[in-house]
Structure formats: structure tokens, C-alpha cells
Amino acid sequence: MMRSHYCGQLNESLDGQEITLCGWVHRRRDHGGVIFLDIRDREGLAQVVFDPDRAETFAKADRVRSEYVVKITGKVRLRPAGAVNPNMASGAIEVLGYELDVLNEAETPPFPLNEYTDVGEETRLRYRFIDLRRPEMAEKLKLRSRITSSIRRYLDDNGFLDVETPILTRATPEGARDYLVPSRTHAGSFFALPQSPQLFKQLLMVAGFDRYYQIAKCFRDEDLRADRQPEFTQIDIETSFLDEKDIMDITETMVRNLFKEVLGVEFGELPHMPLAEAMRRFGSDKPDLRIPLELVDVEDQLKDVEFKVFAGPANDPKCRVTALRVPGGASMPRKQIDDYTKFVGIYGAKGLAYIKVNERAAGVDGLQSPIVKNIPLDNINVILDRVGAVDGDIVFFGADKAKIVSEALGALRIKLGHDLNLLTCEWAPLWVVDFPMFEENDDGSLTAMHHPFTSPKCTPEDLEANPAAALSRAYDMVLNGTELGGGSIRIHDKAMQQTVFRVLGISEDEQQEKFGFLLDALKYGAPPHGGLAFGLDRLVMLMTGASSIREVIAFPKTQSAACVMTQAPGVVDAKSLRELHIRLREQAKAE
């Protein structure tokens, strides 16, 4: 091997030993005839000193520049008193350089690596191979590796088998657009890249592999956000002969073990919260329990008021009127309230009513708001009591369709929590349970809330008679307002699976065309089974404190689903298109 140690491994115990380092020149300094090189590798930094006594080596050190690749042999020694660098893991020692070999020179990088600089993300992605040299980026990928190793160890120790499933498969309706791959040997036909290994892992259960896992690549052609990529990694788990409680216990223990092993963080037992409660109290199916603010329904106090903005929704069963108390918010300036009004508008809210509670004992005179003159004081007092308002608070109101109010005030709750530094703890995990089987589209049709293979809590007859009332055997693990993973008990009975397909409007012909292989499998002794999948990228993002999953993926795509480094996607030559039986239509020319 060319090196004897990594830079980050050097410490006082190696004092007096000869070692060899390989890495990049992170920083070069010349002080009073002595040259200092900070050498960097994936494990950290080490300071190497060259003095003029070794003239040939000193001359080489004088010629090297930042990002040269070097091999250095020297002796470890303790730094002089007062020269210890507490910001470096190896800051108590340095290496007196004897030999220096330049393994490769380097041009000046497009951005500096040895200090924080405000470099645009596109530039960083264009030169990702340089961006990843930065210690903070290397630390994220190293932590990602520790996370996957911990998960694999836990699952292996608990009897799970790591089984690969196909990447080239066929399109199935899973909620997002598929990435399609044309077949050269089957003209006019296409493979689809998997959005998840869902059906294959269920088939593995039918085959008798009762504990399966896979660190799986998945693909979705969807609009991108901070927590989305066209290709992403999933910790995929499936089991047979276990119920919801068993699966949740196994995966919860896995996550608790992971956080303790990797971050030294210990969780207690995760609370369980029904979806209806999460939406009612927090306006979200993935509530952030670190924020001590809650939505409180107040329709009953506003049904008969003259203020139609409140009275209309208060009397409509499809609407919601909700209050959100912010402690100490009465001092909030009007501009800040206006900014929050614009913010909730993003979610469809038409406005943001409020009451500033200056002095409750003074009655209406102690309340500051354009709306108090339209609501009887007795009703206002009931509302203020219900939300727990005291002098110095502000209470915001939302009144509209239930979905709009929940989304708008739920998002406002999160924003207020961060803007006003209200977070009460660093980590707040929970399980969200009791999801509906279906959700209604604007046209009145139904779609599966999770996917069409989720088992309901009722019989096929009850499901078909009243599908909107059916609850599923699904569960999501949520951490700090982010969905870490979701899963369910699956349907293992053919009649139940066909009932779900019928409720979703999938004809028998379409069932056979798209899911015939699954329906066939369910005829041959499918066991009760269920599972869960965690988003690895999201998990690493949370554990590293990164602002985007792009920060924890080695070579991510941009928000327009492109790779600026390789220039993918790219144009394909005419010969390749002919072999794939594809002809491109000419784009209309802009006038």
C-alpha cells in the first residue's frame, strides 16, 4: 500500500513513528523559511512541516500548490506548546516531512475548498468530484455509509435476507409517472423503472422468503422539491406472519438502534397518533411535535355571527374554522402579519384573520383586531379560553375548505415554530396510524391513499358498500415533520384485492393486463404479510442536518432532473433510435 495511515488517524500515540500519507494539498503556508502543508484525505487533515535541512524535499514542497496529489513520508512529533490546533482531530501533532512525491499536479479549482464560500449549487454540481473533496461533504457521505451498515447489521441479525429485485419491469399505477425504457427486441413495448419493489417483495412473501430487505434504487418522474429526486434509495422491508404491531416494533427498534449507534441519540418508545388527530391538531399527516403550537377548531362559536367569512365555513360540513394561538405574538408588527398572510396564500387561503390579546380583563378594548366588532365578546372569550390565550398572545384564524385550512395553518404553524425559535427538542419521532383506504378526487372518483395493495380493516362487503369510511392497516413513521417511512399490512386474499381494484374503477381486463401475475400468485397460498419502506436519502438528510437530499447523494440531479456534470439526459443518435423503433416528432418552431 502507498500509505500507512489516513490523515485523520494521526494522534499523540504515534509520536516518534515514521508514517506515510497520501492525499491532496489542502493549504500551503510559508513561515520564516519553513513550509507547512495541510494534507487532506477522506478521514481528515494533517499538518506536515518541511525545513530547509532537507534541501531536495524542501524544494519540492516549495513548488506544490493547492489540490496537488502527494505522497509524504515523515516522522510524527508533538506540536510545540501554543501551536496545538483544537479544530483538527490531529491538531496535537504534526509530521516532519522527509520525502515528498508529487503524484499529480492540479489546475486551480473553480472554487476554493479550504474555506466556506458562497458557491452556486449548479457550479458545485458541475464539478461534483471537487465539491465532494470538501470535508463537510465527505462527512455526509461517510455518515451515510455508517447508516446503511448499521441497518444491514440489524436486519441481518434479525433473520432478514437481502434479495435483489428487477430494475427493468413493467409500468404499474403507483401515483407518479414512470421512467420508461424502450425495448429493442420487443418493438413498440417499454420497460418501466420501478417506483418501488412493492409487487416483487410481495411475490417473495408468496415464495416463502418471510423476512426480506433491500437497499433499493427507485425511480419517479415527478416534479422535484427539496426532498425529491428522480432516482432515490429506499430501505425496503417485507415480512410474513407478522401483524402491524410486530412490524412497527421491529422497524422502530431498528431506527432507535441506528440513532443511538450513529449519533448517540436515544429515543423513548414512539407515540402512536391517528391520522384524524394529526390533521385536527397539527394540520398535517406528518406532524412536527417539536413545535408546541396546535390548531383548535372553533366552528361552534362562529356559526351565528354576522361575519360571513367565518359563519359560512362554520356552517359547511366540508369546511373548517380553526384558531392557532402564538404565545407572545401580540408584539408582532403588521408587516410580519402581512408576510404570514402572503405565506398562507400559497396554500389557497384567502386571508389570515387575527386577534391580538393585549389585556383580556379590559374586554373588547383589550383586544386588537378588525374582526372583534363582528363577533360577540362572549364567543370571543370562549375561543380565547379554548386556545389558552393570555395577555401578550396573538391568535390566528383560518376559515375555508377543511383541506385548505389544515394545509395553510399547518404550514404556518411550522413556519412560526422556526421563525420564533419555539422548538422544544431536537428530535420528535412518532407513528401516524389509522389512514383512510381511499381519498376522493375532485371528480368524485377514489384513489388509494397509499397504494392499491394495502389491506383494509374491514370485510370486502363492507369495503364495497362504503369505501369512503374504510380505514387501512397502514402506518407511517414521522420524524421532525418529515415522513421517514411508510408501510402497511398487504392484501393476501384474491377476492379482497379484486374488490379494491373495483372500488378504484380498475376493470377486470385492466386487472388482468397490469396485475394478472399478482392475482395468480394470490391463488397459490399467499401468506399474511406486510412491510415498510424508509427513504434513505431523507433519513441521512435529517441525521446530518443537511438542507436538501442533494447534499447527501454523491451525484444528484438538479431540480429540473438533469445532471449538469455529465449533461444527462442527452440526445441519442438516429441509428440508436431506429434500433429502438422510435421516431421523434419535430418540435414546433417558436415564432
Swiss-Prot record:
CDD domains cross-referenced by the UniProt entry: AspRS_core, EcAspRS_like_N
Annotated site location: Important for tRNA non-discrimination: 31, 82
Domain of life: Bacteria
Binding of ATP, residues: 220-222, 229, 483, 535-538
GO biological process: aspartyl-tRNA aminoacylation
Positions bound to L-aspartate: 174, 220, 450, 490
Keywords attached to this entry: Aminoacyl-tRNA synthetase, ATP-binding, Cytoplasm, Ligase, Nucleotide-binding, Protein biosynthesis
Signal peptide limits: none
Region (Aspartate): 198-201
Enzyme class: ligase
GO cellular component, one term: cytoplasm
EC number(s) reported in the record: 6.1.1.23
Entries under Gene3D superfamilies matching the protein: Bira Bifunctional Protein, Domain 2, GAD-like domain, Nucleic acid-binding proteins
Subunit structure: Homodimer.
Full protein name: Aspartate--tRNA(Asp/Asn) ligase
Native organism: Ectopseudomonas mendocina (strain ymp) (Pseudomonas mendocina)
Lineage start: Bacteria, Pseudomonadati, Pseudomonadota, Gammaproteobacteria, Pseudomonadales
Gene from which this protein is expressed: aspS
